[in-house]
Regions:
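Acidic (Asp/Glu) carboxylate-rich active-site/surface patches
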Residues: 1-37, 41-145
Length: 145
């Protein structure tokens, strides 16, 4: 049985005519001193059921987050991590620095055909050349995010 997060991604793939859903989210926008960090993640369809218990990380216990992290990094899940430094945040502003971190995180996925990036938040990531769809509260709606 699939989770609501899996169903959301499946419906987005159908609606957007995508073969590949990549989730992108950031962390670190709250601290006064950077960096802001973003992650882009692609879970192959054959592995989606292995992560049926994934939910918004803010709703998980520390122990569950650690367990999921270990499962993700040891599985065939493709991911990229991007950073924007405190200096880049000061120079660009936090929103533009977040988009920079997202672009850096998604770099390895740029050549995937028929891919769509689901971006957590109300705005598309400026400068990201992947087709993208912003999803408000995406980390609570999408498995990929």
């Amino acid at each position: 049985m699939s989770s609501p997060l899996q169903e959301f991604d499946k419906q987005q793939a159908i609606r957007l005519e995508a073969n590949c859903i990549i989730g992108i989210d950031e962390a670190g926008r709250g601290p006064l001193a950077g960096p802001v960090v973003a992650c882009a993640c692609f879970i192959p369809p054959a592995m989606v059921s292995d992560f049926a218990d994934v939910n918004d990380s803010k709703k998980l216990t520390e122990k569950k987050r650690e367990e999921l992290y270990n499962r993700l990094v040891h599985a065939e899940v493709a991911y990229g991590i991007g950073f924007a430094s405190a200096q880049e945040i000061d120079r660009l502003n936090i929103l533009q620095a977040t988009f920079l971190a997202m672009r850096r995180a998604a770099y390895k996925f740029l050549n995937l055909p028929h891919a769509v990036a689901l971006i957590d938040g109300p705005y598309p990531a400026a400068g990201l050349t992947l087709r993208q769809e912003p999803v408000i509260d995406g980390d609570a709606k999408s498995l990929a995010i």
